């Protein structure tokens, strides 16, 4: 049936936006129109416009972890965001509303439910996200990335996390590792905003390694941190030996070429590592509002697909020692174990569900 429309709600970091784009692309290939509901400041403003998808922006940035004044401001913005969300739903008349997780889904999801629009919530982590917990009464389905506690409810459906098709089509680990020689190729990824602890530790760890044990390093810093990280490598005498990037625009290519990734343990990051079949050193972000990343890292490590390195245990000497002890046989084993955990085709399964709810 032609002329169907999906409203994708995702904002903030790449972990919400990139899987939303994967589902959007799949639905577009089936003839659907896509409209995006985001905010004025998140990464969606960088990633969505180049796709040609219309981006509607709410003046809302969340209320958790902002302090008293920030929380009050967020609460006022939230009230306005409910009205703005309703206006966008009336304007675009979506057949399905797709929430990718995070605070931006709250006003749009509530209004979708009140206006009798089918609402699909994507829960990337094993545990139930707070925003999704609040929205469950309004939801038609809760799509889960992992078979964890979030998947236990009556509305839950385990599909895996939507991953870009370019990553799912990366060659198998054995084919990629065949014939590789020379220094290990290591990719450091701190997420779309960068990771302070990785930015501070990697230059020191590289400096502690003898030249013959030093990997060929590509380090994604986050745009705001690029100059400081560049200065740290310069001070260590290593600037010319390291490729620095503020943001990775060609992640499928980078994953296919590297031997190891050092990164955080967000659900989408972990899902992409599994889809690509890439070994990793996972340094999860653990904050007062969530421990989802720690759970993800432990799950990967228990499966033999990654090394779990808690942030409080991360130091330059330890990381240098870990890197010095690696060889490609070890890395290939972990790469194949990661690939075995992948749930390929998740974007298609979420798109199938959207079509079912729209009556196709």
UniProtKB/Swiss-Prot annotation:
It is found in: Cell inner membrane. GO terms for cellular component: plasma membrane. Its main location: membrane. It is a peripheral membrane protein. Its EC number is 2.4.1.227. It comes from the Bacteria. Keywords: Cell cycle, Cell division, Cell inner membrane, Cell membrane, Cell shape, Cell wall biogenesis/degradation, Glycosyltransferase, Membrane, Peptidoglycan synthesis, Transferase. SUPFAM superfamilies: UDP-Glycosyltransferase/glycogen phosphorylase. It catalyses: di-trans,octa-cis-undecaprenyl diphospho-N-acetyl-alpha-D-muramoyl-L-alanyl-D-glutamyl-meso-2,6-diaminopimeloyl-D-alanyl-D-alanine + UDP-N-acetyl-alpha-D-glucosamine = di-trans,octa-cis-undecaprenyl diphospho-[N-acetyl-alpha-D-glucosaminyl-(1->4)]-N-acetyl-alpha-D-muramoyl-L-alanyl-D-glutamyl-meso-2,6-diaminopimeloyl-D-alanyl-D-alanine + UDP + H(+). GO terms for molecular function: UDP-N-acetyl-D-glucosamine:N-acetylmuramoyl-L-alanyl-D-glutamyl-meso-2,6-diaminopimelyl-D-alanyl-D-alanine-diphosphoundecaprenol 4-beta-N-acetylglucosaminlytransferase activity; undecaprenyldiphospho-muramoylpentapeptide beta-N-acetylglucosaminyltransferase activity. GO terms for biological process: carbohydrate metabolic process; cell division; cell wall organization; lipid glycosylation; peptidoglycan biosynthetic process; regulation of cell shape. UDP-N-acetyl-alpha-D-glucosamine binds at residues 13-15, 164, 192, 293. Cell wall formation. Catalyzes the transfer of a GlcNAc subunit on undecaprenyl-pyrophosphoryl-MurNAc-pentapeptide (lipid intermediate I) to form undecaprenyl-pyrophosphoryl-MurNAc-(pentapeptide)GlcNAc (lipid intermediate II). Belongs to the glycosyltransferase 28 family. MurG subfamily. NCBIfam families: murG. This is UDP-N-acetylglucosamine--N-acetylmuramyl-(pentapeptide) pyrophosphoryl-undecaprenol N-acetylglucosamine transferase. It comes from Chromobacterium violaceum (strain ATCC 12472 / DSM 30191 / JCM 1249 / CCUG 213 / NBRC 12614 / NCIMB 9131 / NCTC 9757 / MK). The gene is murG.
